[in-house]
């Protein structure tokens, strides 16, 4: 089966995806499809490093601002909407360029229906659930949560089987489908995805991350979180558990000072970048590009036009 070709530019946070993707899109009449699990949310702009109108520079962007902050958004829903965007872009004679660092979104597109397996994994969700299990009556609360969304799996699991309960809840949060009803058969991807991943020296990346956090704070990150809470967005909803938001909430409640908050913002973002790179190394047939090098764009240009992986 001949499948239509799509290009994917991925990489950890602060690796330079936005600038390089805009340059590539302008050169090849591309429209960008966002592949970021946080930029889908409206009103969450600063903490998600959402590209500004100026940064977009006239390039159409899709899959940004498609959900409210208090709305649950599954990877299955992303897959369906992103594929519809790609098909529409191609139908208009343009090319789709997917850009973002959410690995399980890419996996779901490249391996459709494999949502109950490796494609559905998010360490931040897992860590949250595992922490809950350590609290008073945590195992019981975890089991009750599972029973509400997936009674069949809950009935099969012993109260002490925390690992499987966490896994089942993780899959449900990511896919919107109970673990017991996850499809078992993987189908062919609708499109062929050609992937390039940005990287750079770790110390340089971490320095860029710290500067980005400082810039976000200067741009009004604290005020953005305060505004979301004032509008009634629950502090414990999926979107507010994201890095850049969950650290600010205790600060606004007077439960931590700014020194600790700033430290956690930078530490958690560095850890997130490390997890992103770990995930991306699992992908096959990927061009790795050091975005700090002068020839980074030229390598991407060659990859785009010739399919070069060297």
Descriptions of predicted regions:
Residues 1-310:
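Phosphate/pyrophosphate-binding catalytic cores of soluble transferases and nucleic-acid-acting enzymes
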């Amino acid at each position: 089966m001949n499948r239509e070709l799509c290009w994917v530019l991925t990489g950890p946070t602060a690796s330079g995806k936005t600038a390089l993707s805009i340059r590539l899109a302008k050169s090849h009449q591309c429209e960008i499809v966002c592949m970021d699990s946080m930029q889908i949310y409206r009103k969450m702009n600063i903490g998600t490093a959402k590209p500004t109108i100026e940064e977009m520079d006239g390039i159409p962007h899709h899959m940004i601002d498609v959900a409210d902050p208090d709305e649950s958004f599954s990877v299955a829903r992303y897959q369906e909407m992103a594929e519809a965007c790609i098909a529409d872009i191609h139908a208009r004679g343009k090319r789709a360029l997917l850009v973002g660092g959410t690995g399980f979104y890419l996996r779901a597109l490249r391996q459709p229906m494999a949502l109950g397996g490796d494609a559905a994994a998010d360490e931040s969700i897992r860590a949250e659930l595992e922490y809950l299990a350590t609290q008073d009556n945590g195992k019981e609360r975890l089991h009750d949560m599972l029973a509400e969304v997936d009674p069949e799996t809950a009935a099969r699991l012993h109260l002490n089987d925390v690992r499987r309960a966490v896994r089942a809840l993780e899959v449900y949060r990511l896919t919107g489908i109970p673990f017991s009803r996850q499809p078992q058969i993987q189908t062919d991807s609708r499109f062929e995805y050609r992937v390039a991943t940005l990287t750079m020296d770790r110390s340089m990346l971490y320095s860029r991350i710290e500067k980005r956090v400082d810039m976000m704070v200067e741009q009004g990150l604290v005020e953005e979180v305060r505004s979301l809470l004032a509008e009634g967005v629950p502090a414990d909803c999926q979107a507010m558990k994201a890095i850049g938001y969950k650290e600010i909430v205790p600060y606004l409640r007077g439960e931590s000072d700014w020194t600790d908050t700033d430290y956690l913002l930078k530490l958690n973002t560095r850890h997130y970048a490390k997890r992103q790179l770990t995930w991306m190394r699992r992908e096959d047939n990927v061009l790795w590009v050091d975005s700090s090098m002068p020839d980074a764009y030229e390598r991407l240009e060659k990859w785009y036009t010739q399919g070069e992986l060297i």
